[in-house]
Amino acid sequence: MDFALIVAPIVGILALLFAFYKASSIDKANPGNDRMKEIASFIEEGAMAFLQREYKALLMFVAILFVVLIIGINWQTAISFLVGALFSALAGYFGMKVATKANVRTANAAMEEGMNKALNIAFSGGSVMGMSVVGLGIIGVSILYILFPDPAIVTGFGLG
């Protein structure tokens, strides 16, 4: 097996571990007073409702395109597409959960501890989404390439 196929999933796992580390550091930050927590809970509820509705709409598109790929190309590319869509949804979910937590903590840090602390929390929140996308992307492409060692098949992952 090629060295890159061994190292790449490890790098993906490290990216996800970094994302989880950053997410846990955001969780530890002070979310502020009761009113701030209440507003943050409304924002989180709205964000999760949005994602749920968006994912329901995307599910129909993913299902149709999955069938089209099976018929038009091959089942391996269709599976790659499905894995890509799933990993994309996971990254979006992680990103949204952390972003809603980071927002209130950033606002509170700006009020109580200053701009440097607030920017640190805000950038940490953004890095969770970025590292989730990178980690899941590298892991997904690596595993699919190990299973289907044809770059044309793995391109379905990117479509997802």
What residues fall within each predicted segment?
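Hydrophobic, small-residue-rich transmembrane alpha-helices and their short perimembrane loops
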Residues: 1-160
